[in-house]
Design a protein with these regions (language model features):
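Conserved glycine-rich Rossmann-like NAD(P)H-binding loop of the short-chain dehydrogenase/reductase
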Residues: 27-41
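Active-site helix of classical SDR
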Residues: 115, 151, 159
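Residue(s) in the substrate-gating loop at a strand-loop-helix junction
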Residues: 135
Length: 238
């Protein structure tokens, strides 16, 4: 039996990188990078079974080129994990239209482009699954991160809508909303700030990327789960 192929969009850092590392024993893994080519080449070198492709999710042409490369190499894509995203803190009244649009263009419009390019073939095969990384801020909102929160809420809404739309095509859509996770996005926090965050979490500590990967593996392997937003936050949003 041929191994299925997983495409991890935004797989050179953080949760995406941890996902790539965890999947190569069971799947062929393609992952994308944009501004972190050096990190991507290191991953490709150190993780047998992984293939790195450049992709700028802000460009439909780049996503279409990605599909061509994936199909030349693997013939098809069975699962897509969308980890691409950016975050920043800023008061709403200080946001420019450019700030707002760039956030949406990567976090949600990038997902739209990837699905626009890859989904039709999944529908023809009546097989596939998509997992997108959202955030707890997409559920409860975050002060000074309105543009980020809006983009992540959009991922949850899109996931639920497409899960209904393509259920009869045997394509599953799910998303994961992590809470505080040790990735680059927390790298600017001081030790005191990290301690304060941990104290607000019922389980008493900040999560690791592997905690999110566990959720991804569950969603990949359970064929009876669709339309779900899996919250992995140590109880933070209770």
């Amino acid at each position: 039996m041929l191994m299925e192929t997983v495409l991890v969009v935004g797989g050179s850092r953080g949760i995406g990188k941890a996902t790539v590392k965890s999947l190569t024993q069971k799947y062929n893994v393609a992952f994308t990078y944009c501004k972190s080519k050096e990190e991507a080449l290191i991953i490709k070198k150190n993780i047998p079974g992984s293939t790195a492709f450049f992709c700028d999710v802000e460009s439909m042409e780049s996503v279409e080129a990605l599909k061509n490369l994936c199909y030349e190499r693997f013939g098809k894509i069975d699962h897509i994990i969308y980890c691409a995203g950016i975050a920043e803190s800023r008061l709403f009244v200080d946001l420019t239209e450019k700030d707002w649009l760039r956030m949406q263009n990567i976090n949600i419009n990038g997902l739209f482009r990837v699905l626009s390019v890859f989904l039709k073939d999944m529908v023809k095969r009546k097989s596939g699954s998509i997992i997108a990384i959202s955030s707890v801020w997409g559920i409860v909102g975050a002060s000074m991160e309105s543009h980020y929160s809006a983009s992540k809420a959009s991922i949850i809404g899109l996931t639920k809508s497409l899960a209904k739309e393509y259920a009869l095509s045997n394509i599953r859509f799910n998303c994961i909303s992590p809470g505080a996770i040790y990735t680059d996005m927390l790298s600017k926090f001081s030790e005191q700030e990290l301690s304060d965050v941990a104290n607000d979490i019922p389980l008493g500590h900040i999560g690791d990327a592997s905690d999110v990967v566990s959720g991804i593996l569950f969603l990949l392997n359970n064929n009876y789960v669709t339309g779900q937003n899996v919250v992995i936050d140590g109880g933070w949003t209770l």
